[in-house]
Amino acid sequence: MAHRKRQSTASSMLDHRARPGPIPHDQEPESEDTELPLESYVPTGLELGTLRPESPTPEEQECHNHSPDGDSSSDYVNNTSEEEDYDEGLPEEEEGVTYYIRYCPEDDSYLEGMDCNGEEYIAHGAHPVDTDECQEAVEDWTDSVGPHTHSHGAENSQEYPDGHLPIPEDDPTVLEVHDQEEDGHYCSSKESYQDYYPPETNGNTGGASPYRMRRGDGDLEEQEEDIDQIVAEIKMSLSMTSITSASEASPEHMPELDPGDSTEACPPSDTGHGPGRQEARPKSLNLPPEVKHPGDLQRGLKTKTRTPEERPKWPQEQVCNGLEQPRKQQRSDLNGPTDNNNIPETKKVASFPSFVAVPGPCEAEDLIDGIIFAANYLGSTQLLSERNPSKNIRMMQAQEAVSRVKRMQKAAKIKKKANSEGDAQTLTEVDLFISTQRIKVLNADTQETMMDHALRTISYIADIGNIVVLMARRRMPRSASQDCIETTPGAQEGKKQYKMICHVFESEDAQLIAQSIGQAFSVAYQEFLRANGINPEDLSQKEYSDIINTQEMYNDDLIHFSNSENCKELQLEKHKGEILGVVVVESGWGSILPTVILANMMNGGPAARSGKLSIGDQIMSINGTSLVGLPLATCQGIIKGLKNQTQVKLNIVSCPPVTTVLIKRPDLKYQLGFSVQNGIICSLMRGGIAERGGVRVGHRIIEINGQSVVATAHEKIVQALSNSVGEIHMKTMPAAMFRLLTGQETPLYI
């Protein structure tokens, strides 16, 4: 590769600043659709299944190719020729892929749920749609929803292997966008960003990948129906009307799509190359229009930034169609109040994920049009990973990618020196183009596209010193893929290995690059909301956070557990071979100390004979073994192991069998943050006012504001909770204990 002369020191310092610069695309990609099954989720975190990903297809360039083995983690530089497939050994039809990206919101979006008889729990989400007419004019999103409030399986998610490298001594900024995974919680990270994509407003059309996924008209129609229905539900939530009433609403209140809007949303883009790199770039990231070289004027791509009013709107017919089939909710979500025509509309709020503006170094308008950073491309490699790697493992993977690329560079340099006695040039100067639609890597000299990734395919960004690691999902077909390698036959989804492509760059502005990509996700989501007539400020949770911060945690539990009079150490006598004679149940997720509760005692058994224990007591430890945080089955096993002992030492906290809950809700617009089914609390939003008030998953509601609800219908319980303002007093107990005490279950003593 020709070695380009570096700029002067002053120019070089300016050269690394970002500048707006729309990057053209060689051709329009065909849209790709996949079936999107509806799963359920509590809308406290943002998780989106993305559509129509584009395979990162680097164009030809003068560099050394290191083709990876299909089933290994071989290093390679991401430069391929027409004769080589990007992933050696994969058939051409595998180039189409559905990627699933999960947004990990801030701490208030952790979800813990329990399966209540398997009924669906439906919430609202945003879904992508593609149209043949506009090709890539509208990029919206879909949430996968399913029978668990916290489960989001993505068949075709791709993740990467657990590395064993030390965490870097530097304190790198990490921007993380997770895949959808079937795990029990959402990842919380203040450096995570929402993965939503607005319509193509900057003229940046799809990448130039020659590989396309075949799509049937039936799939498109099904997908559009789901998307339209969900977008309609979002709008309904924001207008505070129920699904039933909204389905009967007058059509004139629905947005319409003029034929002109569709044309405006997807202006044809000319094939060409982006502007060349300038010798000096502005110092500020609030950038004026750049001056192009004469040779670049012919290659420039004209873009237009549209106002929210000009962006595509959803057709009236599609919105109405989505409302004609209201879903039967077996669980009632109390993240927002249920519908009540007697309540003023202004008092209701959407149960839709909050919008959190992510600060960054760029102006939103610049990110929509696209900005460019100067960098040196060091190389690429691929890794394998499980579906659900932790944040630490992600960081190790980034370190592993850097190590591999550096080893590869060193080997290439030695080889070049051996072949040609001169000094070898192993760095490639590139322009890193970042927008709300995609990330492109352009050769700085020729402006040829080396890599092109849709923003939604980016799963992880890390800056380590002056190194930037960009991780993107690999292609994966709908059927079983060679990209998915099971370590053992019949391995679970979480144990499968998935491929990921890692690009490594070097730049003085590594931190700015990482921050800008993270900011791009936030701006993309904001644009998506506006394009669908939703004001992001309506989803802001700032006031809600302020209310939460004024409330005490766990009601009076802290005082009760810290009172030494309630903490007792007991010594029980029993005969050898005799069971303790107790039934224990879980205290419920959300309790200050997750342990087991004494739910029943056998008449004449050692526990009952002692007279020292009461139903409702929480057992902290047995014979010095702590039970706090252990699964119920483990605790039961420890108790069963006492059979051959004659003395048992227990540490307990005396508690009444009924838990008192106090929820402070100043206004109906503040969500309660839990869901109920048949009087049982099924899920709970971490950090919400319900958790702070003492609500626990798995508890049955016995009383609300002094009124017994034991024999009350589910709908009336939900209505009572949804319409309650001020202090909401509840009494609850573990559902299993309630069934034992009411004779619905026969106790199995241990």
Curated annotation (Swiss-Prot):
Region (STXBP1-binding): 185-271
Gene Ontology annotations for the cellular component aspect, listed alphabetically: presynapse; Schaffer collateral - CA1 synapse
Residue positions where Phosphoserine is found in the record: S11, S209
Pfam families for the chain: PDZ, PID
Residue ranges constituting the PID domain according to the UniProt record: 367-556
InterPro entries (alphabetical): APP-Binding, PDZ, PDZ_sf, PH-like_dom_sf, PTB/PI_dom
Transmembrane segments: none
Keyword annotations from UniProtKB, A to Z: Phosphoprotein, Protein transport, Repeat, Transport
Annotated GO MF terms: amyloid-beta binding; identical protein binding
Region of interest (Disordered), residue spans: 1-94, 143-346
Domain remark in the UniProt entry: Composed of an N-terminal domain that binds STXBP1, a middle phosphotyrosine-binding domain (PID/PTB) that mediates binding with the cytoplasmic domain of the amyloid-beta precursor protein, and two C-terminal PDZ domains thought to attach proteins to the plasma membrane.
Role according to the record: Putative function in synaptic vesicle exocytosis by binding to STXBP1, an essential component of the synaptic vesicle exocytotic machinery. May modulate processing of the amyloid-beta precursor protein (APP) and hence formation of APP-beta.
PANTHER family reported for this sequence: AMYLOID-BETA A4 PRECURSOR PROTEIN-BINDING FAMILY A MEMBER 2, SYNTENIN RELATED
Name used for this protein in its record: Amyloid-beta A4 precursor protein-binding family A member 2
Species in which this protein is naturally found: Mus musculus (Mouse)
